[in-house]
Each structure stands twice: as structure tokens, then as C-alpha cells.
Amino acid sequence: MSLMNTDLHSSLKKYFGFSKFKGLQEGVIQNILSDNDTFVIMPTGGGKSLCYQLPAIMKEGTAIVVSPLIALMKNQVDAIRGISEQHGIAHVLNSSLTKTEVKQVKEDITNGVTKLLYVAPESLTKEENVEFLKKVKLSFVAVDEAHCISEWGHDFRPEYRNLRGIINRLGDNIPIIGLTATATPKVQEDIIKNLGMTDAKVFKASFNRPNLFYEVRPKTKDVDADIIRFVKQNQGKSGIIYCLSRKRVEELAQVLQVNGVSAVPYHAGFDAKTRSKYQDMFLMEEVDVVVATIAFGMGIDKPDVRFVIHHDIP
């Protein structure tokens, strides 16, 4: 085992408590530690986050992680802070922070405390943030949920397409890591082209998930009663129920609550504080079920979700 491998395995054990890597993780991390551009395509649950978290902790400087959702960023920052004595090891930089909080974030980055800085793409377009980040040592930029770049993807975000130009402004030869769980060949090509990483090493994991199975049931006029029955048969297990409309989300969550199921609603119509509260309740096992629109779910790291119900055809 080479010195890099020895360091890698001891760091994996030290920071994350794992004795071995999963799937392609080790090769991905070695490529990142060698300062190469890297493109990672892994299914949900494949361990994508660790692919940039571990090298960020090991490398000198701060890694920028571009993420589309405040909920996702908060989830990951909390997890990283949980493995370190340094509260400032990971930070979010977004519009919800007060001036005092922004000052603290910048101090921690300048002092070399912060290893992971999570930002929404909009935050990177702010001139004051660009000017600040130009002056500090950056280890790499990781673009999570990279399919948001592609107009051919299912979750296109226009602000993602400006990332390459901004990264160029932050410094020369900053390695770029693109990560996604959902990319057709056309979307993959678009991501690589848009991020200007044609020399990137591509790591693509198998998408076969033998632990998952699908079931299609007839939707009766008593669908609410059917869902209540199913959830009660799986009492105490975590689950997500997706609905097409916000109105239906709130109605169904209320019906579940009235029938003794611990459930919360979640959709983009709630303010950030409420969304964050409901997400935390689900992650911390305070409720069993989230009834949601597609605003919920991207990047949520909860290892024990046991069922997902689609109330309406997506």
C-alpha cells in the first residue's frame, strides 16, 4: 500500500469512522488529491459526498462546494461539524446569513480553519464574495448536483451555467469536481463541456440497486385510507410521500396527523426557516413521514428511508 493509500485509509477512519472505501470512492479521491479535474456519476446512496469531503479535509486551503439547495448545504455542514472539534471546519455562505455571521465565515477561511465552504451558485456571482475568495487559498471547486448545469437535465438551473467563468476569476488552474446521480450521456457531455473539463477523469458507478423494488398499486377513491393503512403497517419507519400540488401536500399531511401518523408537509411555498425546521424534524427522527412536492429530497442524506410513495403520477 502506497503512502497516499495509507494516509487515505487512516484519514477515512479518523474523520468518518469507516475502515474501507465504498465502490469507486478511493480512485475518485486519489484523482482529486492529485489536483486533477474529476467527473463522478454515482447513484444516490453511492457515497458521492465523501468523495470531496475527505480530500477537502486532507488538502491545504478551502474547497468550495456549489450546491443548489439551502437544505442540502445545511445537512452536510451539520454532518461535517459533527466529526470535528473545529466548528468552523465547514460553513455555508448564502443570503440568509447576518453581517456578523458572514464576518465569522470569512475569518475562519482566512485563518485556514474552514475546509469546506458550501455556496449556492447565486452567492458566487456576488462581486464581494468573488473578490474575497480570490485572495484566499482554494483547494478545489466541487459542483454537486452537476446535472443542474444542463438544459437537457430534469432540474436545469440557469445560474449553474455561469460557474466556469466565475471559477476562472477565482484563480488559475483550480481543479474542478463535477458530481451527479442522474445524467444521461447527453447531459454528461453538456456538463463536461460547460465546466470546461474535457480532460477530466470520469468515474461512473453501476446504477443497479438490488435493495430497491418498485410496486404499482391501483389508485382507488379511498387513496388516503390506503396510504394511512400502508404507513401504519410500517409504523416507526421513515418515508416520503410525493404529491404534485402544494395544496394536496398540506391536505394529506393533515389527514395523516389526524389519524395518528407523525407527519409534516414540505414545499417551496414555505419560508426557508419553516422548510429547515421540517427537514430537521425528519432527519432527527421527530417525525416519521414527510409529505412533499419535488422541492424536497435532492441530496437529503438519511440512510433509513424505507418507503417512497408517489401519490400522483410524476
Features from the language model and the residues they span:
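Basic/polar N-terminal segments that are highly enriched at the extreme N-terminus
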Residues: 1-4
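Helicase motor core with emphasis on the C-terminal RecA-like subdomain
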Residues: 6, 10-15, 19-23, 27-39, ...
